[in-house]
Amino acid sequence: MLLRPKSGNILKYGHFLSKRWLTASKLLYSVEEMKIKISQDQYRKALEERIDKIPIENYRNFSIVAHVDHGKSTLSDRLLEMTGVIKPGSKSQVLDKLDVERERGITVKAQTVSMFYNDGKQDYLLHLVDTPGHVDFRAEVSRSYASCGGALLLVDASQGVQAQTVANFYLAYSMGLKLIPIINKIDLDSANIAGAKEQIETTFELDPNDCIAVSAKTGLNVEQIIPSVIKNIPSPVCDVNKPLRALLVDSWHDPYVGVVMLVHIVDGKMKKGMKILSAHTNRTYDVKEVGIMYPDRTPTSFIKAGQVAYIIPGMKNPREALVGDTFYQMGKHEDLEPLPGFEEPKPMVFVGAFPADGKEFNAMDDQMQNLVLNDRSVTLEQETSNALGLGWRLGFLGSLHASVFKERLEKEYGAKIILTAPTVPYKIIYKNGEEKIVTNPDDFPDNQKHYDVESYMEPYVEAIMTVPNEYIGNVMTLCLNNRGEQKEIEYLTTGQVLLKYEIPTSQLVEDFFGKLKGCTKGYASLDYEEAGYRKSDIVKMQLCVNGEPQDALTTVIHRSQAQARGKEYVTRFKKYLSYQLFEVAIQAKINNKVVARETIKAKRKDVTQRLHAADISRYKKLLERQKEGKKQMKLSGKVTIKNDAYQAFLRRED
């Protein structure tokens, strides 16, 4: 039982308990009064006592499966309000910590929040794990699902089932999660609840009678969700009496306390001062702080089996925080097996990154390193370009991941950065049996090395698209033009079609989603997953200016696209070059063979303007001398290309 708090003590953070629980506990204080009256120590002690009294059978860990913009963050806010974690009307999108998450309406980093709920009879401890929905962040999604017993399958009543919903459903289903269908945005005039229920039944084989129709915006029927979670989602399978095993779900870098890790305690307890051991790096750490997210970091003296909580391990190098790693208590780890699911993230998209101003490299290098600390899935190594100077070769999980990283760099550090055209990891198989993965187009075998190669392999993805019936022809044409191969077509209800195509990853990263949105007037949705490597006729194309290859503009393409792409490149690059005193040739070359060419005519000075009209021999002599001089300049002259030309070309400023 809580002691009546002394007046005058001010609690500086967080809501304590829901009004429902306060009433059930016969306390007369509201949440706001508790904030004022309970000191920080009393608050923490009361919080720990309440957690300790809740049996693991009353824990529920769940996530929300949804397509982008189907209302996941808004629904999370309503659930937090309902359980007293935040005040009604407080800031929206509580779980979206990054600016880019709020602005784009996407979740990039996995987050969690703890909630207390009392049904009038007993207490429950709920952990809502907010996961990214986009395939680029699928590693974080699968790790988050591993800490959950179930999920809310959120579907927009006006849009129905979308591609991301389908992909994340199958991921959650494959991991054994219990799914509760939620139909959101029923307050819209365009809402079609019956159609959404039919789609849920036909696409996911879920009982439409289990659907809960809500409006996260207005709060209509949201109160039905948590009782359904308690009834349908199982409690975590764990044992507080066993030795400690904790799964690392996510991590981030805090400038004041260092690395903060989000962990799922599978067995045992963890407390401040405990020495823990990493299963994969074999390094030990002294735990500086443990606690729950309520909704922000709220320290407690312990966290126990079943909880999804945070720890501050005193880790000096954030690169040691391997998502999916298992942590044990030092000295009690013998014969313990690591938890399944650890896998190093594999970048699928690579870009060259260079500061817009070369003088800023050193300052930007520090900023780049700091940002990478928060995202272990980004690979980073320095590289040098003849055209753009010092820079970095960055590896990302996908094109959205690359775009988000660039935006975070600009918003959080004010840095201006140039990204080269995205490329994918190609596999080269040599005649001697050696295999090599190439991530930089400049390293792709050229004409001299071509004869040592047995075959070239390029990665493919299985793209899942949902489109309205009237645009199916446009989408099929788009996929065909991008070397796609149809695998499946399924007609959903309410005029929607589900298409599955296998498409080269290189085509996907070249704004395929933008083109898909364009040919469907914005109504299509897309998700994808890796589909392995295939043998392919791919070639290295170099853009040469007066015979000099421009390494920053080298690309790898399919031979069938060589002529069209070469023509596009030389025509566009010509716009950004200034006139010279001699003729300049811009060529696209494949294995030293020119596939496209543009010419910039030489500046011409009128050397005959002072001659008399009748002096024909002198006139011809001067023209001949000028012609010979330009020929010599072309042979020995060097074209100076301003950095702005590369920037404009790579940014596609047409």
Curated annotation (Swiss-Prot):
This is Translation factor GUF1, mitochondrial. Residues 57-237 form the tr-type G domain. InterPro entries: EF-4, EFG_III/V, EFG_V-like, EFTu-like_2, G_TR_CS, LepA_C_sf, LepA_CTD, LepA_IV. Signal peptide: none annotated. One of its GO terms (cellular component) is mitochondrial matrix. The keyword Membrane applies. It is an enzyme of class 3 (hydrolase). Promotes mitochondrial protein synthesis. May act as a fidelity factor of the translation reaction, by catalyzing a one-codon backward translocation of tRNAs on improperly translocated ribosomes. Binds to mitochondrial ribosomes in a GTP-dependent manner. GTP binds at residues 66-73, 130-134, 184-187. Its EC number is 3.6.5.-.
